[in-house]
Protein backbone atom coordinates (compact mmCIF):
# COMPACT_ATOMS: atom_id res chain seq x y z
CA UNK A 1 0.00 0.00 0.00
CA UNK A 2 1.32 3.47 -0.85
CA UNK A 3 0.33 6.64 0.98
CA UNK A 4 0.94 10.17 -0.23
CA UNK A 5 4.13 10.48 1.81
CA UNK A 6 5.58 7.00 2.20
CA UNK A 7 5.45 3.47 0.90
CA UNK A 8 4.38 0.73 3.27
CA UNK A 9 5.32 -2.95 3.11
CA UNK A 10 2.64 -5.25 4.54
CA UNK A 11 3.93 -8.70 3.58
CA UNK A 12 5.71 -9.62 6.83
CA UNK A 13 6.40 -13.33 6.43
CA UNK A 14 8.30 -14.28 9.56
CA UNK A 15 9.33 -12.96 12.98
CA UNK A 16 12.32 -14.51 14.76
CA UNK A 17 13.38 -12.88 18.02
CA UNK A 18 14.29 -9.28 17.17
CA UNK A 19 14.24 -9.93 13.39
CA UNK A 20 11.44 -9.20 10.94
CA UNK A 21 11.43 -10.79 7.47
CA UNK A 22 9.54 -8.74 4.86
CA UNK A 23 8.76 -10.11 1.39
CA UNK A 24 8.82 -8.04 -1.81
CA UNK A 25 10.91 -5.32 -0.19
CA UNK A 26 14.07 -5.59 -2.27
CA UNK A 27 14.00 -1.84 -2.94
CA UNK A 28 14.82 -1.18 0.73
CA UNK A 29 18.51 -0.35 1.06
CA UNK A 30 20.93 -2.02 3.46
CA UNK A 31 21.26 0.13 6.58
CA UNK A 32 17.99 1.99 6.00
CA UNK A 33 16.01 3.12 9.04
CA UNK A 34 12.38 1.98 9.04
CA UNK A 35 9.26 2.29 11.16
CA UNK A 36 7.26 -0.82 12.11
CA UNK A 37 3.58 -0.35 12.95
CA UNK A 38 1.38 -3.00 14.58
CA UNK A 39 -2.39 -3.41 14.45
CA UNK A 40 -2.96 -1.06 17.40
CA UNK A 41 -1.03 1.77 15.79
CA UNK A 42 2.01 1.42 18.06
CA UNK A 43 5.27 2.11 16.23
CA UNK A 44 8.77 0.72 16.68
CA UNK A 45 12.04 1.64 15.04
CA UNK A 46 14.24 -0.75 13.09
CA UNK A 47 17.13 -1.03 10.67
CA UNK A 48 17.52 -3.09 7.50
CA UNK A 49 20.43 -5.49 8.07
CA UNK A 50 20.07 -7.72 4.99
CA UNK A 51 18.47 -7.41 1.54
CA UNK A 52 17.94 -10.10 -1.10
CA UNK A 53 15.69 -10.61 -4.12
CA UNK A 54 13.19 -12.46 -1.93
CA UNK A 55 13.03 -10.38 1.24
CA UNK A 56 14.54 -7.80 3.55
CA UNK A 57 15.61 -8.59 7.12
CA UNK A 58 14.93 -5.88 9.70
CA UNK A 59 16.41 -5.68 13.18
CA UNK A 60 13.79 -4.16 15.51
CA UNK A 61 15.08 -1.63 18.05
CA UNK A 62 12.49 -2.65 20.64
CA UNK A 63 10.78 -5.91 21.57
CA UNK A 64 8.75 -7.72 18.91
CA UNK A 65 6.12 -8.96 21.35
CA UNK A 66 2.67 -7.97 20.12
CA UNK A 67 3.61 -7.83 16.44
CA UNK A 68 1.32 -9.90 14.23
CA UNK A 69 2.17 -11.10 10.72
CA UNK A 70 -1.25 -10.10 9.41
CA UNK A 71 -1.32 -6.52 10.72
CA UNK A 72 2.35 -5.46 10.90
CA UNK A 73 3.56 -2.97 8.30
CA UNK A 74 6.95 -1.44 7.54
CA UNK A 75 7.68 2.01 6.11
CA UNK A 76 10.92 3.76 5.21
CA UNK A 77 12.07 6.63 7.46
CA UNK A 78 15.59 7.32 6.15
CA UNK A 79 17.74 5.71 3.47
CA UNK A 80 20.58 5.28 5.98
CA UNK A 81 21.05 5.78 9.72
CA UNK A 82 21.77 9.45 10.36
CA UNK A 83 22.43 11.59 13.42
CA UNK A 84 21.53 15.23 13.87
CA UNK A 85 24.70 16.92 15.16
CA UNK A 86 25.41 20.28 16.74
CA UNK A 87 27.94 21.96 19.02
CA UNK A 88 25.11 22.11 21.54
CA UNK A 89 25.56 18.36 22.10
CA UNK A 90 28.52 19.16 24.37
CA UNK A 91 27.37 18.79 27.97
CA UNK A 92 24.49 16.49 27.04
CA UNK A 93 23.62 12.81 27.64
CA UNK A 94 22.04 10.58 24.99
CA UNK A 95 21.00 6.95 24.66
CA UNK A 96 22.66 4.61 22.18
CA UNK A 97 20.51 5.93 19.32
CA UNK A 98 21.29 9.58 19.99
CA UNK A 99 18.06 10.44 21.81
CA UNK A 100 18.37 12.78 24.85
CA UNK A 101 18.12 11.09 28.26
CA UNK A 102 18.97 14.10 30.44
CA UNK A 103 15.48 15.59 30.55
CA UNK A 104 16.39 18.45 28.21
CA UNK A 105 14.83 19.14 24.78
CA UNK A 106 16.24 17.49 21.65
CA UNK A 107 19.24 19.17 20.09
CA UNK A 108 18.51 21.47 17.15
CA UNK A 109 20.62 19.83 14.46
CA UNK A 110 23.05 21.90 12.41
CA UNK A 111 23.56 18.90 10.09
CA UNK A 112 22.27 15.35 9.71
CA UNK A 113 25.21 13.04 9.02
CA UNK A 114 25.51 9.41 7.95
CA UNK A 115 26.70 7.57 11.06
CA UNK A 116 29.00 5.37 8.97
CA UNK A 117 31.14 8.42 8.26
CA UNK A 118 33.11 9.34 5.17
CA UNK A 119 36.29 7.47 4.25
CA UNK A 120 39.41 9.38 5.31
CA UNK A 121 41.79 9.74 2.36
CA UNK A 122 45.06 8.08 3.45
CA UNK A 123 47.03 10.71 1.51
CA UNK A 124 45.29 13.46 3.50
CA UNK A 125 46.20 12.02 6.89
CA UNK A 126 48.75 14.00 8.89
CA UNK A 127 51.35 12.29 11.06
CA UNK A 128 50.19 12.10 14.72
CA UNK A 129 52.88 13.85 16.77
CA UNK A 130 51.28 15.92 19.54
CA UNK A 131 51.21 14.63 23.12
CA UNK A 132 47.90 14.19 24.99
CA UNK A 133 48.25 14.36 28.77
CA UNK A 134 45.93 11.96 30.58
CA UNK A 135 47.18 12.84 34.06
CA UNK A 136 48.05 9.16 34.65
CA UNK A 137 51.79 8.58 35.10
CA UNK A 138 51.96 5.06 33.66
CA UNK A 139 50.25 6.20 30.46
CA UNK A 140 51.93 9.60 30.09
CA UNK A 141 55.48 8.38 30.73
CA UNK A 142 55.51 4.76 29.54
CA UNK A 143 52.74 4.45 26.92
CA UNK A 144 52.13 8.02 25.80
CA UNK A 145 48.91 8.84 23.97
CA UNK A 146 49.40 10.93 20.82
CA UNK A 147 46.75 13.14 19.20
CA UNK A 148 45.14 11.18 16.36
CA UNK A 149 46.17 7.78 17.74
CA UNK A 150 43.96 4.78 18.51
CA UNK A 151 45.25 3.21 21.73
CA UNK A 152 43.08 0.50 23.35
CA UNK A 153 42.90 -0.52 27.00
CA UNK A 154 42.85 -4.29 27.59
CA UNK A 155 41.12 -5.08 30.87
CA UNK A 156 39.30 -8.03 32.42
CA UNK A 157 36.06 -8.84 34.18
CA UNK A 158 35.93 -7.26 37.63
CA UNK A 159 38.83 -4.86 37.01
CA UNK A 160 38.33 -1.11 37.46
CA UNK A 161 38.32 -0.09 33.78
CA UNK A 162 35.15 1.96 34.28
CA UNK A 163 36.88 4.02 36.97
CA UNK A 164 39.95 4.35 34.74
CA UNK A 165 37.79 5.49 31.81
CA UNK A 166 36.11 8.12 33.98
CA UNK A 167 39.49 9.35 35.26
CA UNK A 168 40.88 9.71 31.74
CA UNK A 169 37.73 11.53 30.60
CA UNK A 170 38.06 13.89 33.56
CA UNK A 171 41.78 14.63 33.29
CA UNK A 172 42.79 14.36 29.62
CA UNK A 173 43.99 17.46 27.80
CA UNK A 174 46.20 18.59 24.94
CA UNK A 175 48.59 21.06 26.63
CA UNK A 176 47.98 24.48 25.12
CA UNK A 177 44.60 23.51 23.63
CA UNK A 178 42.46 23.16 26.76
CA UNK A 179 39.75 25.47 25.36
CA UNK A 180 39.09 23.40 22.25
CA UNK A 181 39.39 19.92 23.78
CA UNK A 182 36.30 17.71 24.06
CA UNK A 183 35.51 14.15 25.13
CA UNK A 184 32.96 11.91 23.43
CA UNK A 185 32.17 8.99 25.71
CA UNK A 186 30.25 5.97 24.40
CA UNK A 187 29.39 3.07 26.72
CA UNK A 188 27.77 -0.14 25.49
CA UNK A 189 25.91 -2.80 27.46
CA UNK A 190 25.85 -0.93 30.78
CA UNK A 191 24.07 -2.19 33.86
CA UNK A 192 21.90 0.28 35.76
CA UNK A 193 24.65 0.61 38.39
CA UNK A 194 27.20 1.51 35.70
CA UNK A 195 24.85 4.05 34.12
CA UNK A 196 24.45 5.71 37.52
CA UNK A 197 28.22 5.63 38.11
CA UNK A 198 29.13 7.35 34.85
CA UNK A 199 26.30 9.87 35.10
CA UNK A 200 27.20 10.87 38.66
CA UNK A 201 30.96 10.82 38.02
CA UNK A 202 30.77 13.14 35.01
CA UNK A 203 28.43 15.51 36.83
CA UNK A 204 30.33 15.44 40.15
CA UNK A 205 33.72 16.21 38.61
CA UNK A 206 32.49 18.77 36.08
CA UNK A 207 33.75 16.66 33.17
CA UNK A 208 30.26 16.74 31.61
CA UNK A 209 30.75 20.40 30.67
CA UNK A 210 33.17 19.39 27.89
CA UNK A 211 31.77 15.93 27.13
CA UNK A 212 29.11 14.22 25.04
CA UNK A 213 27.79 10.97 26.56
CA UNK A 214 26.14 8.09 24.69
CA UNK A 215 24.94 5.43 27.15
CA UNK A 216 23.57 2.12 25.89
CA UNK A 217 22.05 -0.15 28.54
CA UNK A 218 22.39 -3.91 28.74
CA UNK A 219 18.62 -4.32 28.28
CA UNK A 220 18.59 -2.25 25.08
CA UNK A 221 18.41 -4.12 21.75
CA UNK A 222 21.62 -5.61 20.41
CA UNK A 223 21.45 -3.58 17.21
CA UNK A 224 21.53 -0.39 19.29
CA UNK A 225 24.93 -1.49 20.63
CA UNK A 226 26.18 -1.62 17.05
CA UNK A 227 24.97 1.91 16.38
CA UNK A 228 26.25 3.52 19.61
CA UNK A 229 29.97 3.80 18.71
CA UNK A 230 29.03 5.06 15.25
CA UNK A 231 26.85 7.76 16.80
CA UNK A 232 29.77 8.77 19.02
CA UNK A 233 32.32 8.82 16.20
CA UNK A 234 30.01 10.82 13.93
CA UNK A 235 29.66 13.41 16.69
CA UNK A 236 33.44 13.43 17.23
CA UNK A 237 34.18 13.89 13.52
CA UNK A 238 31.73 16.77 13.31
CA UNK A 239 33.23 18.56 16.32
CA UNK A 240 36.78 17.89 15.10
CA UNK A 241 36.61 18.64 11.41
CA UNK A 242 33.79 21.20 11.33
CA UNK A 243 34.56 23.13 14.55
CA UNK A 244 38.26 22.46 15.17
CA UNK A 245 37.98 20.51 18.44
CA UNK A 246 40.58 18.00 19.55
CA UNK A 247 38.24 15.15 20.45
CA UNK A 248 39.09 12.15 22.61
CA UNK A 249 36.65 9.29 21.97
CA UNK A 250 36.39 6.66 24.72
CA UNK A 251 34.52 3.49 23.71
CA UNK A 252 33.65 0.97 26.43
CA UNK A 253 33.09 -1.97 26.50
CA UNK A 254 33.99 -3.17 22.98
CA UNK A 255 33.51 -6.76 24.18
CA UNK A 256 29.79 -6.02 24.57
CA UNK A 257 29.80 -4.55 21.06
CA UNK A 258 31.40 -7.67 19.57
CA UNK A 259 29.03 -9.97 21.43
CA UNK A 260 26.11 -8.01 19.96
CA UNK A 261 27.70 -8.52 16.54
CA UNK A 262 27.83 -12.26 17.24
CA UNK A 263 24.23 -12.30 18.49
CA UNK A 264 22.90 -10.64 15.35
CA UNK A 265 25.07 -12.85 13.14
CA UNK A 266 23.59 -15.90 14.83
CA UNK A 267 20.04 -14.63 14.39
CA UNK A 268 20.77 -14.16 10.67
CA UNK A 269 22.14 -17.74 10.57
CA UNK A 270 25.53 -16.60 9.29
CA UNK A 271 28.43 -19.03 9.19
CA UNK A 272 30.42 -18.32 12.38
CA UNK A 273 34.16 -17.75 12.58
CA UNK A 274 36.49 -18.05 15.58
CA UNK A 275 34.57 -18.72 18.82
CA UNK A 276 31.28 -18.03 17.09
CA UNK A 277 32.10 -14.44 16.10
CA UNK A 278 31.33 -13.48 12.49
CA UNK A 279 34.16 -13.71 9.99
CA UNK A 280 33.80 -10.02 9.13
CA UNK A 281 34.44 -8.83 12.71
CA UNK A 282 37.94 -7.61 11.78
CA UNK A 283 36.51 -5.43 9.01
CA UNK A 284 33.73 -4.18 11.26
CA UNK A 285 36.14 -3.18 14.04
CA UNK A 286 38.44 -1.52 11.50
CA UNK A 287 35.52 0.59 10.25
CA UNK A 288 35.35 2.04 13.79
CA UNK A 289 39.00 2.29 14.80
CA UNK A 290 40.19 3.78 11.51
CA UNK A 291 37.97 6.81 12.04
CA UNK A 292 40.67 8.20 14.35
CA UNK A 293 43.24 10.54 12.89
CA UNK A 294 44.49 13.99 11.99
CA UNK A 295 43.65 15.49 8.58
CA UNK A 296 46.02 17.84 6.80
CA UNK A 297 44.69 21.39 6.61
CA UNK A 298 42.09 20.88 9.35
CA UNK A 299 42.74 22.04 12.92
CA UNK A 300 40.83 19.34 14.79
CA UNK A 301 41.57 15.69 15.43
CA UNK A 302 39.95 12.46 16.61
CA UNK A 303 41.81 10.26 19.11
CA UNK A 304 40.39 6.94 20.27
CA UNK A 305 40.70 4.89 23.45
CA UNK A 306 38.64 1.72 22.96
CA UNK A 307 38.30 -0.27 26.19
CA UNK A 308 37.59 -4.00 26.17
CA UNK A 309 37.37 -6.67 28.85
CA UNK A 310 39.24 -9.80 27.75
CA UNK A 311 37.16 -12.95 28.38
CA UNK A 312 39.07 -15.14 30.87
CA UNK A 313 41.92 -12.55 30.73
CA UNK A 314 42.88 -14.16 27.40
CA UNK A 315 44.81 -11.69 25.25
CA UNK A 316 44.64 -14.17 22.34
CA UNK A 317 40.82 -14.05 22.34
CA UNK A 318 39.51 -12.82 18.95
CA UNK A 319 38.37 -9.44 20.31
CA UNK A 320 41.72 -8.23 21.78
CA UNK A 321 43.61 -10.13 19.08
CA UNK A 322 41.89 -8.35 16.18
CA UNK A 323 41.87 -5.04 18.05
CA UNK A 324 45.64 -5.31 18.47
CA UNK A 325 46.12 -5.78 14.72
CA UNK A 326 44.19 -2.61 13.90
CA UNK A 327 45.26 -0.23 16.66
CA UNK A 328 48.61 1.27 17.61
CA UNK A 329 49.52 -0.43 20.87
CA UNK A 330 47.71 -1.39 24.06
CA UNK A 331 47.42 -0.42 27.72
CA UNK A 332 47.05 -3.52 29.91
CA UNK A 333 45.12 -3.45 33.20
CA UNK A 334 46.70 -6.03 35.52
CA UNK A 335 44.77 -8.28 37.90
CA UNK A 336 47.79 -8.81 40.17
CA UNK A 337 48.30 -5.08 40.72
CA UNK A 338 44.58 -4.64 41.35
CA UNK A 339 44.71 -7.39 44.00
CA UNK A 340 47.35 -5.32 45.84
CA UNK A 341 44.99 -2.34 45.96
CA UNK A 342 47.01 -0.35 43.42
CA UNK A 343 45.02 2.09 41.27
CA UNK A 344 45.13 2.50 38.36
CA UNK A 345 46.47 -1.08 38.03
CA UNK A 346 48.23 -0.54 34.68
CA UNK A 347 51.15 -2.89 34.03
CA UNK A 348 53.76 -1.05 31.90
CA UNK A 349 55.60 -4.23 30.84
CA UNK A 350 53.02 -5.66 28.39
CA UNK A 351 51.77 -2.16 27.52
CA UNK A 352 52.93 -0.35 24.40
CA UNK A 353 52.31 2.84 22.45
CA UNK A 354 53.66 2.53 18.91
CA UNK A 355 53.39 6.27 18.29
CA UNK A 356 55.00 7.37 21.57
CA UNK A 357 58.26 8.38 19.92
CA UNK A 358 56.43 10.83 17.63
CA UNK A 359 55.05 12.99 20.43
CA UNK A 360 57.56 13.09 23.28
CA UNK A 361 61.01 14.51 23.88
CA UNK A 362 62.59 17.95 23.61
CA UNK A 363 60.13 20.65 22.63
CA UNK A 364 57.15 18.33 23.16
CA UNK A 365 57.27 16.96 26.71
CA UNK A 366 60.81 16.94 28.12
CA UNK A 367 64.19 15.97 26.69
CA UNK A 368 64.72 13.08 29.13
CA UNK A 369 61.22 11.57 28.69
CA UNK A 370 62.11 8.65 26.39
CA UNK A 371 65.21 7.64 28.37
CA UNK A 372 63.35 7.81 31.69
CA UNK A 373 60.63 5.58 30.25
CA UNK A 374 63.22 3.03 29.07
CA UNK A 375 65.03 3.07 32.42
CA UNK A 376 61.82 2.58 34.41
CA UNK A 377 60.86 -0.35 32.18
CA UNK A 378 64.25 -2.05 32.56
CA UNK A 379 64.52 -1.50 36.32
CA UNK A 380 60.96 -2.68 37.01
CA UNK A 381 61.45 -5.80 34.88
CA UNK A 382 64.64 -6.56 36.83
CA UNK A 383 62.82 -6.04 40.13
CA UNK A 384 60.04 -8.46 39.14
CA UNK A 385 62.60 -11.11 38.11
CA UNK A 386 64.26 -10.76 41.52
CA UNK A 387 60.90 -11.19 43.28
CA UNK A 388 60.56 -14.57 41.60
CA UNK A 389 64.09 -15.48 42.68
CA UNK A 390 63.42 -14.44 46.29
CA UNK A 391 60.33 -16.66 46.36
CA UNK A 392 62.65 -19.62 45.74
CA UNK A 393 65.95 -18.78 47.48
CA UNK A 394 65.08 -16.01 49.94
CA UNK A 395 66.73 -12.57 50.20
CA UNK A 396 69.97 -13.94 51.66
CA UNK A 397 71.12 -14.90 48.16
CA UNK A 398 70.79 -11.31 46.89
CA UNK A 399 73.48 -8.66 46.56
CA UNK A 400 72.96 -5.18 47.96
CA UNK A 401 72.21 -3.91 44.45
CA UNK A 402 69.61 -6.65 44.00
CA UNK A 403 67.91 -5.53 47.21
CA UNK A 404 67.80 -1.97 45.88
CA UNK A 405 66.02 -3.23 42.76
CA UNK A 406 63.50 -5.06 44.94
CA UNK A 407 62.77 -1.86 46.84
CA UNK A 408 62.59 0.02 43.53
CA UNK A 409 59.85 -2.34 42.30
CA UNK A 410 57.87 -1.77 45.52
CA UNK A 411 58.23 2.02 45.31
CA UNK A 412 57.43 2.02 41.58
CA UNK A 413 54.13 0.27 42.25
CA UNK A 414 53.26 2.28 45.36
CA UNK A 415 54.16 5.78 44.16
CA UNK A 416 54.36 5.79 40.36
CA UNK A 417 51.70 3.30 39.24
CA UNK A 418 49.51 3.65 42.34
CA UNK A 419 48.69 7.33 42.06
CA UNK A 420 45.01 6.91 42.92
CA UNK A 421 42.83 9.78 41.72
CA UNK A 422 45.67 12.28 41.44
CA UNK A 423 45.86 14.35 38.26
CA UNK A 424 49.58 14.61 37.47
CA UNK A 425 51.18 16.75 34.81
CA UNK A 426 53.88 15.04 32.76
CA UNK A 427 56.43 17.12 34.71
CA UNK A 428 55.05 15.75 37.98
CA UNK A 429 55.16 12.19 36.63
CA UNK A 430 58.79 12.56 35.55
CA UNK A 431 59.65 14.04 38.96
CA UNK A 432 58.16 10.99 40.69
CA UNK A 433 60.07 8.74 38.28
CA UNK A 434 63.39 10.42 39.08
CA UNK A 435 62.71 10.24 42.82
CA UNK A 436 62.25 6.46 42.56
CA UNK A 437 65.20 5.99 40.19
CA UNK A 438 67.41 7.95 42.58
CA UNK A 439 67.17 5.01 45.01
CA UNK A 440 69.39 3.09 42.56
CA UNK A 441 73.15 3.73 42.19
CA UNK A 442 74.03 6.04 39.31
CA UNK A 443 76.08 3.22 37.78
CA UNK A 444 72.84 1.25 37.25
CA UNK A 445 71.13 4.04 35.29
CA UNK A 446 72.64 2.97 31.98
CA UNK A 447 69.81 4.29 29.82
CA UNK A 448 70.05 7.85 31.12
CA UNK A 449 72.50 10.48 29.90
CA UNK A 450 75.09 12.01 32.23
CA UNK A 451 73.56 15.45 31.72
CA UNK A 452 70.13 14.18 32.78
CA UNK A 453 71.59 12.40 35.84
CA UNK A 454 73.48 15.54 36.87
CA UNK A 455 70.30 17.61 36.53
CA UNK A 456 67.63 15.36 38.04
CA UNK A 457 69.28 12.62 40.13
CA UNK A 458 68.68 12.92 43.87
CA UNK A 459 65.01 13.90 43.82
CA UNK A 460 63.28 12.82 47.03
CA UNK A 461 60.15 10.72 47.36
CA UNK A 462 57.20 12.53 48.93
CA UNK A 463 54.48 10.59 50.73
CA UNK A 464 51.89 12.80 48.99
CA UNK A 465 52.64 10.84 45.79
CA UNK A 466 51.25 7.64 47.26
CA UNK A 467 47.85 7.66 45.62
CA UNK A 468 44.54 7.53 47.46
CA UNK A 469 41.06 6.94 46.06
CA UNK A 470 38.49 9.68 46.46
Swiss-Prot record:
Single GO MF annotation: proton-transporting ATP synthase activity, rotational mechanism
Signal sequence extent: none
Cross-referenced CDD domains: ATP-synt_V_A-type_beta_C (cd18112), ATP-synt_V_A-type_beta_N (cd18118), V_A-ATPase_B (cd01135)
Entry keyword set: ATP synthesis, Hydrogen ion transport, Ion transport, Transport
Gene Ontology BP, a term: proton motive force-driven plasma membrane ATP synthesis
InterPro entries, alphabetized: ATP-synt_VA_C, ATPase_a/bsu_AS, ATPase_F1/V1/A1_a/bsu_N, ATPase_F1/V1/A1_a/bsu_nucl-bd, P-loop_NTPase, V-ATPase_su_B/beta
Function: Produces ATP from ADP in the presence of a proton gradient across the membrane. The V-type beta chain is a regulatory subunit.
Entry's family note: Belongs to the ATPase alpha/beta chains family.
Name of the protein: V-type ATP synthase beta chain
The species this protein was found in: Deinococcus geothermalis (strain DSM 11300 / CIP 105573 / AG-3a)
Encoding gene, per UniProt annotation: atpB
Amino acid sequence: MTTLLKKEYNDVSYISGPLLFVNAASDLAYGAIVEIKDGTGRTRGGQVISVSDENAVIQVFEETRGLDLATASVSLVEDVARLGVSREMIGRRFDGLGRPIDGLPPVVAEKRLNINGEPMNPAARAKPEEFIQTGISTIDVNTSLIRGQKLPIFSGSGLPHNELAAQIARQAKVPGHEGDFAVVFAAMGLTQREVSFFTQEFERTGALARSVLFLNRADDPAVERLLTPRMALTTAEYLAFEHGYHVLVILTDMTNYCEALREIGGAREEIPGRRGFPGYMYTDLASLYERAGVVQGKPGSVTQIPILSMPDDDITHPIPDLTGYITEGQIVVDRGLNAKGIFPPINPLPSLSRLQGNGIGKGKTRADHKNVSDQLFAAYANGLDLRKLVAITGEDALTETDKLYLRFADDFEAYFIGQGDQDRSVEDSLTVAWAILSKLPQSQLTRLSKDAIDKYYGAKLDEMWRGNRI
